[in-house]
Design a protein with these regions (language model features):
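Perimembrane loop-to-helix junctions flanking transmembrane segments
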Residues: 28, 69-84, 166
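Alpha-helical transmembrane segments with an aromatic anchor "belt"
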Residues: 79-157
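Hydrophobic alpha-helical transmembrane segments and adjacent short intramembrane/lumenal linkers
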Residues: 122-234
Length: 240
């Protein structure tokens, strides 16, 4: 449905959009057969960017809140510290694009064990939609870290415990919010959505490589399983 049709019939556009995402999440086979367009990657790039921005919003708010507390506590924040804080803020949007590309490469490489047909470009277009479940993980983390940042007070800032090296100082500041147990819990919960993304990715690679569904599931289980293990490791490490 075009933009002009959406303007003329917003209700119909909304219904079709909801049906499309329901199919993607719960019936990816139908989604790829019915809804995936044949044009360029514009829609996919925008969609992946949106998933990253959802995570970035909470990080940006947390940085503003935490930095203001440390400034009030007379803790110097130089350009190197500020740069590292910015890097932490934009990590979700940079990371989601790296994840998309990495997922595509992994699916293409592992599926080579079963088939050599299919174009990398087509797989990249399809695998972009597999990251959609991660928008929920990013949303939960954004809400959690945003709330945690509002709870940081000047009384919690001990100048004696603030590291001197700029990068260490940035991480110390960040951890005053990111280190809260409920923020860490959202990282662990994120592993569930990684597995969900892997399920969708199986159908992304299936038709491109002309695989059996069982073969596609085994292919997708490799990158999804490894990434889920890494996410769990990150979450558990934060608890320790």
């Amino acid at each position: 449905m075009s933009v002009s049709q959406a303007v003329r019939n917003p209700r119909g556009y909304l219904v079709r959009t909801l049906e499309m995402y329901r199919a993607l999440l719960f019936d990816p086979e139908h989604f790829y057969d019915e809804y995936l367009g044949s044009r360029g990657l514009r829609s996919e790039i925008l969609m992946v960017a949106f998933v990253g921005v959802v995570g970035l919003v909470g990080n940006y708010f947390a940085r503003q809140e935490v930095q203001s507390v440390f400034v009030e506590a007379a803790i110097p924040i130089n350009s190197d510290t500020n740069f590292e804080l910015i890097r932490l803020v934009i990590a979700p949007i940079v990371g989601i694009f790296i994840l998309w590309i990495g997922l595509t490469i992994a699916l293409y490489a592992v599926s080579w064990l079963y088939s050599t047909i299919g174009q990398f470009y087509e797989l990249m277009k399809r695998s972009a939609w597999a990251v959609v479940p991660l928008v929920v993980a990013n949303l939960l983390h954004s809400i959690a870290i945003g709330y945690a940042a509002t709870q940081v007070t000047e009384d919690q800032v001990d100048p004696q415990n603030v590291p001197q090296p700029p990068i260490d100082r940035a991480h110390h500041m960040w951890d005053t919010a990111a280190g809260e147990i409920y923020v860490t819990a959202t990282i662990l919960v994120g592993a569930v959505f990684v597995i969900w993304a892997g399920y969708i990715a199986a159908y992304a690679v299936r038709d491109v490589r002309d695989l059996e569904t069982s073969e596609a599931l085994r292919v997708a289980a490799v990158p999804a399983g490894l990434y889920a293990i890494w996410v769990l490791y990150q979450g558990v490490s934060a608890f320790l």
